[in-house]
Amino acid sequence: MTIEGVYPDPALFGHDPWWLVLGKALAIFVFLVLTPLLTILAERKVMAWMQMRVGPNRVGPRGMLQSLADGIKLALKEGIVPKGVDKPIYILAPVIAAVPAFMAFAVIPFGPAVSIFGHYTPLQLTDLPVAVLYVLAATSIGVYGIVLAGWASGSTYPLLGGLRSTAQVISYEIAMALSFAAVFLDAGTMSTSGIVAAQEHTWYVFLLLPSFLIYVTSMVGETNRAPFDLPEAEGELVGGFHTEYSSLSFAMFMLAEYVNMVTVSALATTLFLGGWHAPFPLSLWDGANSGWWPVLWFTLKVWGFLFVFVWLRATLPRLRYDQFMGLGWKILIPISLVWVMIVATVRAFRNEGYDARSIALVVAGLVVALVVVVLLWKRLRPGRVPAPEKPVEPRGRAELSPETLEPFDPMAGGYPVPPMPGQTLPAFRRTPVSVTGAHSTGPTQENSDD
């Protein structure tokens, strides 16, 4: 035990009895299975309220059992394996996507050390000297399942969805890792429990505001959620990488997506919102950060981030692919590099005995955060219409005479196609159409005496 008996000593990990370790793992598994069910229901309800609808209201009291009914329906559906797929990889891909999402939660601290049946143990399955890097690596493995699902489906749309997901993860994990680096530099550790202990008095959301904004943006892109859901864009790729999946395989992809949402939300809580520390003014109460109360504060913070996911999906349209890539490579990564250099400089001055850390970081953070907001607004503001491009005349087109242009048959393929540069349409003869008597259907009688 360290720091007045509240924060767990790293030596405590690995010495729990087997039944206690099994109980912790089972509790985390139940938490990660139940939270997506509640998140899906809350998402449908909140989006319905934002769109002035009712939402699920049939299954159970006020529709509270709708997620359970959907899960049972998916489990009872027939699993259809399309013809021409790579069957072993096709079956394993959902498992590869779902398992790392569960593994990443092993190092997330739910609370301080407590007594369970006489054994003093931290409310955390385990901890590592590089725990945050472990989470980053585990969440990165999930994209292999998405890519393999797209490749093994034997279809164009799933393959394009898998390739998009790969580019998305590569682009945004760089910015995410740089936001982690700022936290490591200030906390002096990569251990999740150590980072929580470093935020006992001041949360990093205030000291490292640019890192927080960059991480929140990156975590939405990392989980393929709207407005960054390009790998499964319905209007472009039908269903994306899981177009050819049904039944439990499709359910595992959905479970992996929502478990990843919970994981990145828990990591944001751990790194920037003080972890399981009580928010102000509840922190003024002496017992707020001891016992089982911190589990409640941690869960409420995670649900706050989950609400942000739902809010973004209900309010923002999907970005174009070029906008999305430009946001990652032209805005987030350069600003992350500059911010990490600022944090490293402040840390170096602190090591030399200059204790102006809080003031310097807050001032620099506000400036960088303002720059981030302005750049995001300029790039993503509504009504931004790109300037029309002027048509470029092919080289030599103006000098070509009609005699030198290549003859072109627009009906060669059975349907009309436009000519390419350097080709000309043949002259068509117009068939004259006679309109004489077009409205006459028979002889007319004029001045008839009958």
Swiss-Prot record:
Alphabetical keyword list: Cell membrane, Membrane, NAD, Quinone, Translocase, Transmembrane, Transmembrane helix, Ubiquinone
Entry's EC annotation: 7.1.1.-
GO molecular function: NADH dehydrogenase activity; oxidoreductase activity, acting on NAD(P)H, quinone or similar compound as acceptor; quinone binding
Membrane topology: Multi-pass membrane protein
NCBIfam families, sorted: PRK06076.1-2, PRK06076.1-4
Function: NDH-1 shuttles electrons from NADH, via FMN and iron-sulfur (Fe-S) centers, to quinones in the respiratory chain. The immediate electron acceptor for the enzyme in this species is believed to be ubiquinone. Couples the redox reaction to proton translocation (for every two electrons transferred, four hydrogen ions are translocated across the cytoplasmic membrane), and thus conserves the redox energy in a proton gradient. This subunit may bind ubiquinone.
Protein name from the UniProt record: NADH-quinone oxidoreductase subunit H
